[in-house]
């Protein structure tokens, strides 16, 4: 494990599950992981890390294939990536000596959080979700006002997609910037950080590393679209969802079946955010996260 301090951020690296994981770590106290989505990397939590670190040990990793974490390539079959990511989290926590922890997650990271909570519920103090996929969405991806929003999920699976998007700085800026603008409550909210996103995704392997997620998740997504919402045992650790109402791709109305998949959950919807609540409304997000984990860790110690 080694540490690099850059612009006030504590960057660390550790080996876990056969790969080198990069993460930013601040604070002390009970541990919480911040798991990002796509098109994101650890830096999407830059407005959250310091406030949360006032009370918690905050760990924001780059997921396998993203950011500065190692990119071992597209697995064969691609679906294996999903299991690898869950195994990464467990091995990563073990490497850090953490037995029980909270998880904040969004988008892709929320798949990892849900799958881990099903596999190892005793290690999860609580789950805090921003807009995310869950099984209850079912066939609703194919509704007329939704199917036009998910074209990128097919595009990202094409073998030439990373080469096309990464062919130049402007093409990368245009593609990644589209989602940061279109999915947010207000266009331009990411303007001050857009070049950081472009820098990140132009690093070798980072575009394909993110696109691999869509190769990995396509079979299960197709099953949901054709067969509908599957029956599954409910996730047991306490969960709180903070959902941005303006999200065009993961709609707030789709939260209506959360109770079928989570045994103990609360839902809060904000009209002043889209897909990226943690970045768009950081004060709201930070307050909700702090309150939730102060409660769940306290109750877990009883």
What is each residue range found by the language model?
Residues 34-37, 60:
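Structural cue for short, hydrophobic secondary-structure segments
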Residues 265-302:
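Catalytic active-site module of serine/aspartate enzymes centered on a nucleophile-bearing elbow/loop
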């Amino acid at each position: 494990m080694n540490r690099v301090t850059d612009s006030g951020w504590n960057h660390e690296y550790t080996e876990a599950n056969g790969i080198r994981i990069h993460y930013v770590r601040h604070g002390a106290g009970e541990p919480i992981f911040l798991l990002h989505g796509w098109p994101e990397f650890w830096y999407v939590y830059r407005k959250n890390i310091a406030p949360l670190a006032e009370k918690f040990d905050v760990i924001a990793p780059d997921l396998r294939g993203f950011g500065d974490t190692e990119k071992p390539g597209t697995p064969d079959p691609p679906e294996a990536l999903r299991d690898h990511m869950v195994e990464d989290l467990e091995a990563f926590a073990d490497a850090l000596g953490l037995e029980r922890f909270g998880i904040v997650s969004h988008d892709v990271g929320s798949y990892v959080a849900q799958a881990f909570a099903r596999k190892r519920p005793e290690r999860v103090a609580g789950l805090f979700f921003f807009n995310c996929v869950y099984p209850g969405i079912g066939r609703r991806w194919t509704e007329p006002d939704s199917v036009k929003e998910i074209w990128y999920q097919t595009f990202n699976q094409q073998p030439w997609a990373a080469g096309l998007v990464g062919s130049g700085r402007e093409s990368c800026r245009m593609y990644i910037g589209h989602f940061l603008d279109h999915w947010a409550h207000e266009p331009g909210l990411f303007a001050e950080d857009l070049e950081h996103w472009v820098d990140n995704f132009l690093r070798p392997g980072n575009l394909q590393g993110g696109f691999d997620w869509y190769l990995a998740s396509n079979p299960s997504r197709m099953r949901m679209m054709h067969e509908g919402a599957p029956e599954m045992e409910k996730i047991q650790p306490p969960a709180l969802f903070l959902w941005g109402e303006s999200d065009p791709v993961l709609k707030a109305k789709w939260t209506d079946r959360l109770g079928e998949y989570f045994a103990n959950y609360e839902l809060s919807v904000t009209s002043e955010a889209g897909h990226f609540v943690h970045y768009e409304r950081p004060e709201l997000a930070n307050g909700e996260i702090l309150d939730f984990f102060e409660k769940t860790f306290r109750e877990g110690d009883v």
